[in-house]
From Swiss-Prot:
It comes from Oldenlandia affinis. Residues 1-22 form the signal peptide. There is a cross-link at residues 67-95, 121-149, 175-203 (Cyclopeptide (Gly-Asp)). Disulfide bonds join 71-85, 75-87, 80-92, 125-139, 129-141, 134-146, 179-193, 183-195, 188-200. The keyword Repeat applies. The gene is OAK4. It comes from the Eukaryota. InterPro entries: Cyclotide, Cyclotide_moebius_CS, Cyclotide_sf. SUPFAM superfamilies: Cyclotides. This is Kalata-B2. Keywords: Cytolysis, Disulfide bond, Hemolysis, Knottin, Plant defense, Repeat, Signal. Belongs to the cyclotide family. Moebius subfamily. One of its GO terms (biological process) is defense response.
């Protein structure tokens, strides 16, 4: 766990460095560095057999720190409505983060999360629905994106990551704690969660196969 924490801290520092001094890098250099950060985080997450919620939390946190577009909507029509994302069927992936042979990117991590949720029989929504319809069974159009029929509406606009966060919140309502808040003080306010610095993780949850 110490190894994971050290790698995480280093990765987050690198992410902040890219954000602060990105202007001094070429686009190719920035893409390579970001890819390395994402790949290192994924290796540590899967190496420690983390939960799907933790994978999702780390994906979103790492992407948000850099201010890069978070893709993930389906692209059955062949296009992506999120700026900076391109269609790599069946989901959208970020333009600036190329895939490496033998290596996984953050998009792959998110795709694994979506696939795992689908294998559990719960529809994963998030594709855009500018045409007014959703291709995923069990999802309805809440413009501009699809949301699961059984999920409550949220105030304001929705993004793909907001939809997935609502899914986690729905799980919490069913008695499963949703962790992910920061715990710089060493404690977690959510019952059933423990501090795995710098974020809270669930005390016990079926594990994702590495």
């Amino acid at each position: 766990m110490a190894k994971f924490t050290n790698c995480l801290v280093l990765s987050l520092l690198l992410a902040a460095f890219v954000g602060a001094f990105g202007a001094e890098f070429s686009e190719a250099d920035k893409a390579t560095l970001v890819n390395d950060i994402a790949e290192n985080i994924q290796k540590e997450i899967l190496g420690e057999v983390k939960t799907s919620e933790t994978v999702l939390t780390m994906f979103l946190k790492e992407m948000q720190l850099k201010g890069l577009p978070v893709c993930g909507e389906t692209c059955f029509g062949g296009t992506c409505n999120t700026p900076g994302c391109s269609c790599t069927w069946p989901i959208c992936t970020r333009d600036s983060l190329p895939m490496r042979a033998g290596g996984k990117t953050s998009e792959t991590t998110l795709h694994m999360f979506l696939k795992e949720m689908q294998l559990k029989g719960l529809p994963v929504c998030g594709e855009t629905c500018f045409g007014g319809t959703c291709n995923t069974p069990g999802c309805s159009c809440t413009w501009p994106i699809c949301t699961r029929d059984s999920l409550p509406m949220s105030a304001g606009g929705k993004t793909s990551e907001t939809t997935l966060h609502m899914f986690l919140k729905e799980m919490q309502l069913k008695g499963l704690p949703v962790c992910g808040e920061t715990c710089f003080g060493g404690t977690c306010n959510t019952p059933g969660c423990s501090c795995t610095w710098p974020i809270c993780t669930r005390d016990s949850l079926p594990l994702v196969a590495a």
